[in-house]
């Protein structure tokens, strides 16, 4: 397996404050690596180092096959970066912004205009291309900002809180665009304050807390690792609730909780085999259920277990 991003032991200090304390990250080529962490955990510092905007005090990294320290200029030619807030010039039009970036990347005038037109069409902005950015909605600005970050066809793209402040519809549009990029072989490192975003997009997730990676894996792995599954059963008849409660308590060894209005009975379980046992017991008792399932912990619950902080406390990445 080839890796577009590999970092080992990254350390960064700001005076007496250690922002990163031995961070290891790895992103296979063409994948999305989600980086989660509470405010001040070190997410943005990590991105700035991997984008050559900061030099680490210790550790090493390669990006797109180039050494971050010895080949920084080559790395810059292979990456794109989108920060938390749109960085395009509000006085220029969409076309002018993209052409300007193309020219800065040493494209010819003709090639820069062709690339701008291509990206405006791809991101659904062709009709707005001749308008000043200050007339764009927040979602349109973010889409243009994302387009701007790939003018140079980067191999690696850093997205630092790319959907901050967007409404759900605009956020979903950005998600679709990001997924499309990985289909072309682009590797994405995504920091986000939205756990749903990481759950939806990331192939693997690294959780950073106090400058250290405290967990890494697929979303479902993190969920299983950090909490029990929840057994959920809703009897078809309200009269069966007491008997189902008794059966669930006997199987799990704990008193289940019950939603009195909907009749949903829930209990934490360690062994998923209990679900099969419950099905047999209900069948023996002649009880039918409208709902019967095992639910993994949410990524929010996993995040709380790993960092001691709920996702709601997250804010601007640091």
Located regions from the model:
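Preference for bulky hydrophobic residues occupying beta-strand positions
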Residues: 12, 25, 233-235, 267, ...
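C-terminal coupling/interaction segments
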Residues: 270-318
């Amino acid at each position: 397996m080839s890796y577009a991003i590999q970092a080992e032991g990254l350390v960064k200090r700001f005076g007496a404050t250690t922002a990163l304390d031995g961070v290891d990250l790895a992103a296979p080529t063409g994948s999305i690596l989600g980086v989660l962490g509470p405010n001040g955990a070190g997410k943005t510092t990590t991105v700035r180092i991997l984008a050559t905007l900061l030099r680490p005090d210790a550790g090493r990294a390669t990006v797109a096959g180039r050494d971050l320290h010895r080949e920084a200029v080559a790395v810059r030619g292979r990456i794109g970066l989108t920060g938390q807030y749109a960085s395009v010039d509000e006085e220029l039009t969409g076309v002018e912004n993209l052409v300007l970036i193309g020219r800065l990347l040493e494209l010819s005038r003709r090639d820069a205009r062709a690339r701008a037109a291509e990206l405006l069409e791809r991101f659904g902005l062709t009709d707005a291309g001749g308008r000043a950015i200050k007339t764009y909605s927040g979602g349109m600005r973010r889409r243009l900002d994302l387009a701007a970050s790939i003018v140079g066809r980067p191999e690696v793209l850093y997205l630092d809180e790319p959907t901050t402040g967007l409404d759900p519809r605009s956020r979903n549009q950005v998600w679709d665009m990001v997924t499309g990029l990985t289909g072309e072989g682009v590797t994405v490192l995504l920091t986000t304050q939205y756990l749903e975003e990481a759950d939806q997009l990331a192939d693997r997730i690294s959780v950073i807390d106090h400058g250290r990676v405290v967990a890494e894996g697929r979303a479902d792995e993190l969920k299983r690792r950090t909490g029990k599954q929840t057994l959920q059963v809703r009897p078809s008849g309200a009269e069966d609730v007491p008997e189902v409660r008794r059966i669930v308590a006997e199987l799990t060894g704990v008193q289940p909780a019950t939603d009195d209005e909907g009749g949903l009975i829930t209990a934490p379980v360690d062994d998923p085999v209990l679900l099969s046992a419950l099905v047999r017991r209900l069948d023996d008792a002649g009880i039918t259920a409208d709902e019967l399932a095992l639910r993994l912990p949410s990524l929010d619950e996993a995040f709380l277990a790993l960092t001691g902080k709920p996702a709601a406390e997250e804010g601007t990445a640091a």
